[in-house]
């Protein structure tokens, strides 16, 4: 595993040619200090309010997408995976619609849009490593698997990760295999066992991020989240993911069926 094996960038009013070229070659890019500490705290507070509401009301799904519940280090019920967060949080919605996110659409062909109401919407993942946790790590996968299961053409997409906590090897951390976003369909389907394979890859790169950093990856790239070697509160890792997509507009509603690929999410622990 390689650490600090890539440059980090500053996000300006528009992307530079150097930044676009780096993303095109590697399939990911890391921007430092995109969100302020105040913005991060506001977003975290809003997710805690959402969590309290969903637990109180016993909500199981949002627009057909299951909510992943579990326990924290104090054995309290928590939400590990929040779907469609921006529909319930003004703070998240405002950040998602800010110019910082809008400018990233230039990494995709014309017609790219932020999918607040499509797929799983804006996701917040809350990892914590305790014996009772349902969300300690996530095995190798590509985000494009969803399109494959529905028999759709695999189109380029972005997953924009805003880090709400510091995240390095001590938290497990995101691992990506640079350049795999250009792989053929066979390798996308069969190179690794989706979610079940959590083994280290000799070509993987550790994403070492601070709270407020933003890491953008192509949906076709192989990536995983490793399990923290630490037990308890110090293992906490929260990341908000914003999808930017192409193709036909397909919004989700309360009547939407549960997508088939979510059966695989049961393998994620």
Q: Where do the language-model regions lie?
A:
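Acidic, His- and aromatic-enriched active-site or binding-groove loops in soluble protein domains
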Residues: 136-154
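Non-heme Fe(II)-dependent double-stranded beta-helix
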Residues: 1-25, 32-140
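Short, structured patches in soluble enzyme cores that scaffold and shape functional sites
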Residues: 142-144, 162-166, 178
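Glycine-rich nucleotide phosphate-binding loop and flanking beta-alpha elements
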Residues: 37, 146, 223
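Double-stranded beta-helix
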Residues: 21, 154, 166-224, 249
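Extracellular structured ligand-interaction cores
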Residues: 28, 137, 155-159, 171, ...
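Non-heme Fe(II)/2-oxoglutarate
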Residues: 1-9, 59, 187-194, 214-216, ...
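Short helix-to-loop capping/linker segments positioned immediately adjacent to catalytic or ligand/cofactor-binding
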Residues: 93, 112-114, 146-151, 161-164, ...
